[in-house]
């Protein structure tokens, strides 16, 4: 599989179940080690880096299955996401010196800004397990944004959302791109992807079968066959 993503764009990665989309995200974000090939980011080749190092470089992600700290508040979840940008370190956290306290206050302010950005500041002190499914998705996005990413990889962010929530999500992704953040999007809602992405790549059984503008991908016979079967495509 080979593709490139323009900085500041929204790039979609679609395909049937089991096509390898999430596996690709896991490779890009360091959860899986790739067997061969190269992964270049902003002019540098990234080889066998851990997820925390990749996050520190500017690549953040959300997960297909929501991974929040259920018994922590919304604001605490976002603050945890900010740890890759902290300077105090372990000893500063233990000593609780003035610099650490100042940094923690700045982290909390930034976390409130991000909750406001995703529309959740009014729920800042609510436990994440008490949020609706759609709000938990938005909270996970806020936590990823807390790392100040250059690239944000969203793995099925619209899963389980109703039509109203999907519309709000679409507006949020557009707003994220407006801040100069490149967005990688895995999503089964083809209508959402086609209306949102600048370019799309399609995977099937671990191979790329198409890439291009949304309208071109939508008409590609290989894509139609992958989704509907050879008889329908014919």
Predicted regions and their residues:
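Glycine-rich phosphate-binding loops of nucleotide-dependent enzymes
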Residues: 1-234
């Amino acid at each position: 599989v080979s593709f490139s993503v323009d900085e500041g764009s929204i790039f979609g990665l679609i395909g049937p179940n089991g096509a390898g989309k999430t596996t690709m995200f896991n490779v890009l974000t360091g959860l899986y080690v790739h067997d061969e090939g190269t992964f270049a980011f902003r002019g540098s080749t990234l080889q066998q880096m851990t997820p925390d190092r990749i996050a520190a470089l500017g690549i953040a992600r959300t997960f297909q299955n929501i991974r929040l700290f259920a018994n922590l508040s919304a604001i605490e979840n976002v603050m945890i996401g900010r740890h890759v940008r902290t300077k105090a370190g372990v000893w500063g956290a233990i000593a609780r010196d003035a610099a650490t306290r100042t940094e923690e206050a700045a982290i909390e302010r930034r976390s409130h800004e991000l909750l406001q950005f995703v529309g959740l500041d009014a729920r800042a002190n609510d436990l994440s397990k008490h949020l609706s499914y759609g709000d938990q998705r938005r909270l996970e996005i806020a936590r990823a944004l807390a790392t100040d990413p250059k690239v944000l990889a969203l793995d099925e962010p619209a899963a389980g959302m109703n039509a109203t929530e999907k519309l709000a999500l679409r507006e949020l992704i557009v707003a994220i791109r407006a801040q100069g953040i490149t967005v990688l999007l895995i999503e089964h809602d083809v209508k959402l992807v086609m209306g949102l992405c600048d370019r799309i790549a399609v995977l099937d059984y671990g191979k790329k079968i198409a890439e291009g503008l949304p309208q071109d991908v939508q008409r590609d016979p290989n894509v139609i066959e992958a989704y509907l079967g050879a008889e329908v495509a014919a």
